[in-house]
A protein has these predicted regions:
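Conserved N-terminal beta1-alpha1 strand-loop-helix module at the mouth
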Residues: 1-98, 102-131, 147-150, 157, ...
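C-terminal binding/interaction regions
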Residues: 183
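A short acidic, helix-capping loop that chelates divalent metal ions and anchors anionic groups
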Residues: 81, 138-144
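Hydrophobic alpha-helix-in-membranes signature
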Residues: 135-138, 164
Length: 214
């Protein structure tokens, strides 16, 4: 079995399972549908449940994905990532520092950082992030504080300056993913494109096929 950091580098598609967005699908059921596809990353993001509920959800997903090709990331909660031996944690701009997360989780775990401009991306890389997400590329209701999105030009700049894996994120779907790829992104992260799809697996396969042919 390859290390999860190796799988991170091979992954093209990053699925964010947000309980608020996936209102019609249980996270575990959704993960069980998609986990046997190409190497990918799944992040559990739940900002509405109490911590006990979140731990139960995360444990179920961790158990389902154990020994799979899927990298399992927990959003925000370093302590839950440590408790459940998740593959890593994703931190936003206001969360605990990357250095604290690294000290708690160790060098073998994956730490990702949300970035909205090139300076943030460079800082995250220099501080030892394993990957970054950069966005939102397009307008998305999930990021109302950046109503216009960051645009495709920033993807081009990140492509030229960032050496660690980066995932373009924000409003990306099958109708605009080729524009993102043409701007220099080899990897994308999506939420609504999978969580709100009528059938998650075909939707995932379609996006994955587009990414892997480029």
């Amino acid at each position: 079995m390859k290390s999860k950091k190796k799988l991170l580098k091979e992954s093209r598609l990053y699925i964010i399972i947000d309980k608020k967005v996936c209102a019609q699908q249980f996270p575990l059921r959704l993960v069980n549908k998609i986990k046997n596809g190409d190497a990918l990353i799944v992040q559990l993001r739940d900002k509405q449940s109490d911590k006990a509920t979140l731990i139960k959800e995360a444990y179920a997903l961790r158990k389902s994905l154990f020994n799979s090709k899927t990298v399992f990331i927990i959003n925000d909660y370093i302590d839950i990532a440590k408790m459940l031996d998740c593959d890593g944690v994703h931190l936003g701009r206001g969360d605990l520092s990357l250095e604290i997360a690294r000290r708690i989780l160790g060098e073998d775990k994956i730490i990702g950082i949300s970035c909205h401009n090139l300076n943030q991306a460079l800082q995250a890389q220099n501080r030892g992030a394993d990957y970054i997400s950069i966005g939102p590329v397009f307008p998305t209701p999930l990021k109302p504080h950046i109503p216009k999105g960051i645009g495709l030009d920033l993807i081009k700049k990140v492509r030229k300056n960032i050496k660690i894996p980066f995932f373009a994120i924000g409003g990306i779907n099958e109708t605009n993913i080729n524009k993102v790829i043409s701007s220099g992104a080899k990897r994308v992260a999506v939420c609504r494109a999978i969580c709100q799809a009528k059938d998650a697996l075909p939707a995932l396969k379609k996006l994955s096929k587009i990414l892997h042919r480029n």
